[in-house]
Amino acid sequence: MKTLQMTLSNKKNNFIPYIMAGDHEKGLEGLKETIQLLEQAGSSAIEIGVPFSDPVADGPVIEQAGLRALARNVSLSSILETLKTIDTKVPLVIMTYFNPVYQFGIEKFVAALEKTPVKGLIIPDLPKEHEDYIKPFINDKDICLVPLVSLTTPLSRQKELVADAEGFIYAVAINGVTGKENAYSNQLDQHLKALSSLTDVPVLTGFGISTLSDVDRFNKVSSGVIVGSKIVRDLHEGKENEVIKFIENAINF
């Protein structure tokens, strides 16, 4: 079992915060201190976004964070170079669209990841049918390709998506982009229970989670939560203490 999956399997109430690399007053120089802050607060893993000019899955908060990072000339290459200098006990997960990886060179990208604490990859615009672009390069590495499973995904498709999944399953709690709050389906809890029954891989719930009541709800029917827009917004507004309290409360339900 790879590190990311082992880490999440050994815990309940997993909490994975999402941050945008380079969305800091110090640019990428601030990435290390943000990771340290999130690690010390009790995060199970940390998802790091790569800014992209056409972020189809991102809501306005994360899209704006990406634009701020791009304005600081943050790129996949500069992020990887920065991550090589960071030492953390918490597994990192890179969230990137496929085009930057393809332009960088897939084999070169994976080789660079191996020199960092990155243990997982989320590529939202890479469908299952095209995973062979990535999988052959990471199968024997301590890096997992994390699948996203939507509430509207048919059961037969869910089984395909989780069949050879590693790390964790990213269960998409709402239909649409990230940060769209209070739009949860009444069937969501049952969907998450059903999804969890298909696999031994931890299922974590994300998209739109912004309150401790959301966290409590999803901790009861999945292995934990991923919180993006709230974390990105609070960090941008200088509310580090609020972020720490939120994570501490979330993991201690």
UniProtKB/Swiss-Prot annotation:
Protein task: The alpha subunit is responsible for the aldol cleavage of indoleglycerol phosphate to indole and glyceraldehyde 3-phosphate.
Reactions catalysed according to its record: (1S,2R)-1-C-(indol-3-yl)glycerol 3-phosphate + L-serine = D-glyceraldehyde 3-phosphate + L-tryptophan + H2O
Name of the gene encoding the protein in the UniProt record: trpA
InterPro entries in alphabetical order: Aldolase_TIM, RibuloseP-bd_barrel, Trp_synthase_alpha_AS, Trp_synthase_suA
Matching SUPFAM superfamilies: Ribulose-phoshate binding barrel
Enzyme Commission (EC) number: 4.2.1.20
Record has Lyase as a keyword: yes
Organism: Lactococcus lactis subsp. lactis (strain IL1403) (Streptococcus lactis)
MF annotations from Gene Ontology: tryptophan synthase activity
Family under the similarity heading: Belongs to the TrpA family.
Record's keyword terms, sorted: Amino-acid biosynthesis, Aromatic amino acid biosynthesis, Lyase, Tryptophan biosynthesis
Enzyme class of the recorded protein, top EC level: lyase
Catalytic residue list: 47 (proton acceptor), 58 (proton acceptor)
GO cellular component: cytosol
Membrane-traversing stretches: none
Pfam families attached to this UniProt entry: Trp_syntA
Pathway entry: Amino-acid biosynthesis; L-tryptophan biosynthesis; L-tryptophan from chorismate: step 5/5
Keyword check for Amino-acid biosynthesis: yes
Subunit-structure text: Tetramer of two alpha and two beta chains.
Record protein name field: Tryptophan synthase alpha chain
